[in-house]
Amino acid sequence: MFVDQVNIYVKAGDGGRGQVAFRREKYVPDGGPAGGDGGHGAHVVLEVDEGLRTLMDFRYKRHFKAVQGENGMSKGMHGRKAEHLVVKVPPGTVVYDDDTDAVIADLVHHGQQAIVAKGGRGGRGNSRFATPANPAPEHAENGEPGEEKYLKLELKMLADVGLVGFPSVGKSTMLSIVSAARPKIGAYHFTTITPNIGVVETEDSRSFVMADLPGLIEGASEGVGLGHQFLRHVERTKVIVHVIDMSGMEGRDPIDDYNIINKELADYNLRLTERPQVVVANKMDMPDAEANLEAFKEAFPDLEVFAISAATRQGLRDLLFRIADLVDATPEFGLEELEEKTATPRVVYGYEAPEAGFTVSKDEDDCFVIKGPRIEKLFTMTNFMREESIKRFARTLRQMGVDEELRKMGAIDGDVVRIRDFEFEFIESSF
């Protein structure tokens, strides 16, 4: 089964918890803090494996959770950082954030890696918080939570040449003749329902990878007939070979077929029309093929057309030489040129903006709700089982201006304040 699109969930490892400990040795009174830091949590990493050809493995496992870092220990010993979780994907995999549809990575080359979820930082032990004013702190941090994301993986096959055309025009037959590939061939439409790949070698020892793509129909660019699934595999090809049934035995007009397929390519992605395209008039061994070819050339006098018969191998030698010339002369197309046309341009920056401040709002229960990445991170890394950690948490909120904002919103003693799933009372005298 060929699988070229899946949705998965990834969760990076949390950081290990920092330790509260003190140096306790004979003849060393008041040894001071000696709590170690927690280890960093594991990343979730996608890595290209050239031995894979589809995303089939993800049909059976879609949740990937990395391990957390080791907790800090006494005697100043830090926890071990966790080993990253490496998930193998086939070459040509494009990774999207399923919530924003932003491109996270384009994985092409064997061994190429991309971190799709970062592990959390390990919490600091109490030895990190010692100051002249507080030489023996009883405060340590929890580990930072690892990132979690829903991702969409799309496989856009890596082939130098893509065969496109209506169903039953002879694409599979042509691939089976010029390469060692053995696609399914039948006298009915949509015999090919998944892409097939073969390596073609010319008589002058040049080689290229050719993909036989399932037949397109009118409206493919809008998803008709699984058009989006088929067209995405054309995006990486350097050369498009447009195969046309010149016999007319299916009751179609070769001129109309040529115009319709090119319109679908342009509607799906305008950049596809910039690729070199080789027009192949197939089934020239059939009756009426010559007459149809003459009419086709009259309609497109400036178009280079290769007349062949895949069944009898007529004209294949010159065709393959021409394709090899174009493959050699055409550069690779980068990811920015592969992006599908959308209503608004998709922009992805590598720069990460600084964490924003916070917001205070009231919910339907008159509870004050505080939100903000920095505050929520502080909350998750605070150990509320220790009084000193709670005091430090409250002091940090006050320094950030949270208590002042609550007063502006009308908070008085006894009002409930919520951060994530944690609720506490606003007390003017101590907050």
From Swiss-Prot:
Keywords: Cytoplasm, GTP-binding, Hydrolase, Magnesium, Metal-binding, Nucleotide-binding
Top EC category: hydrolase
Binding-site residues for Mg(2+), renumbered to this chain: 172, 192
Entry binding sites for GTP: 165-172, 190-194, 212-215, 282-285, 309-311
Ranges where the OBG-type G domain occurs: 159-328
GO biological process terms on file: ribosome biogenesis
NCBIfam families xref list: Obg_CgtA (TIGR02729), Obg_CgtA_exten (TIGR03595), PRK12296.1 (NF008954), PRK12297.1 (NF008955), PRK12299.1 (NF008956)
Quaternary structure and partners: Monomer.
HAMAP family: GTPase_Obg
Record protein name field: GTPase Obg
Lineage: Bacteria, Bacillati, Bacillota, Bacilli, Bacillales
